């Protein structure tokens, strides 16, 4: 279940971060409505993918996903925008990912 959850977080991150990047490109880089439309579709897909997580608690899923979003956004910037994170960016992303692990995968009494 953990592997499935992690894979779903990755798919959600690609959809949300990719969608936001497409909208950014369409508006800020003036690439046009097709880019914006593709971004809106990807953002909608992100919302759907989150519902596939095995945990039933919306707040927990979205809170944990926030950490994935932070780290994924830095990686996306590196891959597609030439961004180079500094030490503080990397440490911050690692703290967020540790938070994801605690929120999603810590043992709980049910």
Swiss-Prot record:
Keyword Membrane: yes
TM region(s), chain numbering: 6-26, 32-52, 61-81, 90-110
Domain of life of the organism encoding this protein: Bacteria
Family stated for the protein in its record: Belongs to the UPF0060 family.
GO cellular component, one term: plasma membrane
Keyword hit for Nucleotide-binding: no
Locations listed in the record: Cell membrane
Name the UniProt record assigns to this protein: UPF0060 membrane protein MMAR_2961
């Amino acid at each position: 279940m953990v592997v499935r959850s992690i894979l779903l977080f990755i798919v959600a991150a690609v959809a949300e971060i990719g969608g936001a990047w497409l909208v950014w490109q369409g508006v800020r880089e003036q690439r046009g409505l097709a880019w914006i439309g593709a971004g809106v579709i990807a953002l909608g897909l992100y919302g759907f993918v989150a519902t596939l997580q095995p945990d039933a608690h919306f707040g927990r899923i979205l809170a944990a996903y926030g950490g994935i979003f932070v780290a994924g956004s830095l990686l996306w910037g590196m891959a597609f925008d030439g961004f180079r994170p500094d030490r503080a960016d990397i440490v911050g992303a690692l703290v967020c990912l540790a938070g994801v692990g605690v929120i999603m995968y810590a043992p709980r009494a049910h």
